[in-house]
Amino acid sequence: MSPKKIFFTKGVGRHKERLASFEAALRDAGIEKFNLVYVSSIFPPNCRIISKEEGLKFINPGEIVYCVMARQETDEHNRLIASSIGVAIPADENQYGYLSEHHSHGETDEKAGEYAEDLAASMLATTLGIEFDENMGWDEREQVYK
């Protein structure tokens, strides 16, 4: 069983109870109707990214849906938190790529996103035998993958 399509979504939930907050985030993301099963971070070969709207047409309420999820929570008022999924897809569609989850405190969503992308890219680089200098800027590293 290997997915041929994937979509990304995001959500934010606020409530005094953590479970209710998580449910609100799932609703905000549009995936509250599904039984989510977490999987690790492999982007399948020959898989394509589709819109959330298109992806939701393929799944029904109560269905088991496999997902890579980044989740962060806090009970501290005004605490800055972020979570993000990074994706690294090889040029050769027949090879697998990586999805990385990142969860942080005190970091903006933009910084969390950059970190998750870098993490996914570094995991992919190791499988392709590409030297990956973590101290190099993203724009420079991105050229290695093109």
PLM region spans:
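Helix-coil modules at protein/domain termini and other flexible surface or pore-lining loops
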Residues: 1-146
